[in-house]
A protein has these predicted regions:
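Short beta-strands and strand-coil junctions in structured, solvent-facing domains, enriched
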Residues: 135, 191, 196, 224-226, ...
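Bacterial N-terminal signal peptides that target proteins for export
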Residues: 2-14
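Periplasmic polypeptide-binding modules associated with outer-membrane biogenesis and secretion
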Residues: 27-61, 71-312, 321, 335-353, ...
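C-terminal outer-membrane beta-barrel translocator/porin domains of Gram-negative envelope proteins
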Residues: 269, 303, 411-414, 418-567
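Bacterial N-terminal signal peptides
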Residues: 11-25
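Gram-negative/organellar outer-membrane beta-barrel architecture
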Residues: 147-154, 158-160, 256-443, 516-531, ...
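Amphipathic hydrophobic-ligand
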Residues: 103-107, 195-198, 378-380, 418-420, ...
Length: 568
């Protein structure tokens, strides 16, 4: 029996041990961690303390945002020892922040108050700051070394770097302005001639007693670079020389970042590639002929795009565009388009070769069209073969062109055909390619030819279009975005010279009217009258328009929409 009691006592002790262990484990599971407590505190809105900064506005907002104390407000279980450590470091932290704003001798007082009755937090911290006098720039010493000291035309790069320096004597010193000034001057050197330029050393000597700063910086230009050969990587399908002619990288010219980016953009917008990235070799053994690498990813060989749209001029529109980037055997690109709307049905194709070294390329095109022209339905055909050249601002072309037009309707003019030699020139000189506020553009066409049917009659055709933007006051939105209002002046004049009875294809004559020409009139509803008083194309054209355009502000930002007043 004693033995039996001993066993039961041991069993009870073991059960008691597991019960106590389980209870302790349960207590541990129910006790939240520090991170859980801070999350719960953040969710309930509780805080370890409130923080108030008393200082002039120009420094108060900055301190409230960047003081280290802000990070610990959401910890309601913050211990007194930890809070004392934070308060001890707060003075140095505030001084460091104020120094970045140019205040090197501030008076700072930090007070801690118990607030047991405040629901927001049990403590209140008040940081009182008198920033003192702001440090200003007393002296500036900019120096340059490297090729910029001995190379030709050294004064220009140095002048650009000095002009880009943005922190000058008399201006207040801030760390951000100091960093920006060095970065701006360095970028001015790197953008042209010296892509490997670096900041050799810089120093800001601060005199806290006089509140003045003496700045010095030395830039090392490194060697002068010129564009070397262009190497294409990732290209398998196209002729390398033709692609280089699209890029038009000025081999042998002084390195210019803008030229490099323009060449990259020309390749990217050519349609032959999905991705393009150009880089200059900064470690070239011969900086005077530094190779440039174009890393490309070719676009699909063929692409089809289906479109649907609507316009007030021609109603609903359906279109199908097909691109074949490299025709078999010929190697040219073919762009074919089929479109239907209320006014016209068009099937056309244009084939273009890669450009030669001079930028000129061969172009061939054909178009079949049925279009409402005046009071008639006109079936027309056009064949065109010639050459074209496109540069950044100017496009040129010349071509031999065949036109045929058959008009259908009461008292319709007879079928007419013509053969002509045409040339065109377009110049664009705007301040922006996408949203110009100033500048001008001009397009001119000139052709000489002869009708083939019903009779042979020589003719001359000329057409000119002009557009001019005059900038006005800037429209600024609450978010700081802005764009200028503008006045747009547009004109279009044309003439076809031939004997009075010559039957010129109507596709070579002029009709106007519609939302892009003379607003208030339907599409191509202004023209000449035939002997039977039917509306038809005329031999002379003159259109002028003046329009005031002002950007609209929506949602606090400048939108892409504009209000307009116009006279056509």
């Amino acid at each position: 029996m004693p033995h039996s009691r001993a066993v039961r006592a041991g069993q009870l002790a073991l059960l008691l041990f597991f019960a106590i262990s389980g209870a302790l484990t349960g207590c541990s599971a129910l006790t939240p961690t520090a991170s859980e407590r801070s999350s719960e505190a953040a969710a309930s809105g509780a805080a370890a303390f409130t923080l108030q900064v008393r200082a002039p506005k120009e420094v108060r907002d900055y301190l409230e945002k960047h003081l280290e104390l802000q990070r610990f407000r959401a910890f309601p279980d913050l211990q007194e020892r930890e809070l004392s450590r934070l308060l001890g470091a707060a003075d140095a932290n505030a001084r460091e922040l104020l120094a970045t704003l140019g205040y090197f001798s501030p008076d700072i007082q930090i007070d801690l108050t118990k607030t047991p009755d405040d629901r927001r937090a049990p403590r209140a911290i008040v940081v009182t700051v008198d920033p003192g006098e702001r440090t200003t720039i007393k002296a500036l010493d900019l120096r340059f070394q490297g090729d910029i000291e001995t190379g030709p035309t050294t004064s220009r790069p140095e002048a650009r770097a000095r002009a880009a320096w943005s922190l000058n004597p008399g201006e207040p010193f801030t760390q951000e302005a100091w960093d920006d000034a060095k970065k701006n001057s360095l970028r001015a050197l790197q953008k042209r001639r010296y892509p490997t330029a670096s900041l050799a050393n810089s120093r800001a000597d601060i005199d806290a007693d006089t509140h003045q700063a003496a700045l010095s910086a030395t830039f090392d230009s490194g060697p002068a670079y010129r564009f070397g050969p262009l190497h294409l990587k990732g290209m398998k399908r196209y002729d390398a020389e033709g692609i280089k002619n699209i890029a038009r990288l000025p081999t042998g010219a002084v390195y210019d970042e803008t030229e490099l980016l323009d060449a990259q953009q020309r390749l990217a917008s050519s349609g032959y590639f999905d991705a393009v990235f150009l880089t200059l070799d900064p470690d070239a053994q011969q900086p005077g002929a530094a190779p440039v690498t174009a890393q490309v990813r070719e676009a699909p060989l063929q692409k089809a795009i289906f479109g649907i749209g609507v316009s007030t001029d021609s109603g609903m529109r359906l279109s199908l565009d097909h691109t074949y980037n490299q025709l078999p055997w010929l190697g040219w690109r073919a762009l074919t388009k089929l479109s239907f709307d209320r006014e016209a049905k068009v099937l056309g194709t244009e084939w273009t070769a890669l450009p030669g070294a001079n930028g000129w390329r061969w172009v061939a095109g054909a178009q079949l069209q049925r279009e409402a022209t005046g009071d008639y339905q006109v079936n027309s055909t056009q064949w065109r073969f010639g050459r074209s050249q496109s540069t950044d601002h100017i496009d040129r072309n010349y071509a031999l062109q065949y036109d045929s037009a058959v008009s259908q309707g009461p008292m319709a003019p007879p079928e007419s055909t013509a053969l002509s030699l045409n040339t065109g020139w377009t110049g664009r000189y705007f301040d922006s390619k996408t949203a110009p506020a100033s500048g001008w553009g001009l397009a001119a066409e000139f052709g000489v030819g002869t009708t083939l049917r019903p009779e042979r009659d020589p003719f001359v055709r000329a057409l000119a279009r002009g557009l001019y933007f005059q900038p006005l006051a800037k429209v600024t939105a609450p978010d700081g975005s802005s764009r200028r209002a503008r006045i747009a002046l547009r004109t279009e004049v044309g003439a076809v010279l031939a004997r009075p009875g010559a039957q010129i294809p109507v596709t070579q004559l002029f009709l106007t009217g519609g939302d892009t020409t003379v607003r208030g009139y339907s599409l191509r509803s202004i023209g000449a009258r035939t002997e039977s008083d039917q509306l038809f194309g005329g031999r002379y054209l003159a259109v002028a328009s003046a329009e005031w355009q002002r950007p609209l502000v929506f949602g606090g930002t400048v939108s892409d929409f504009e209000s307009a007043l116009f006279v056509d």
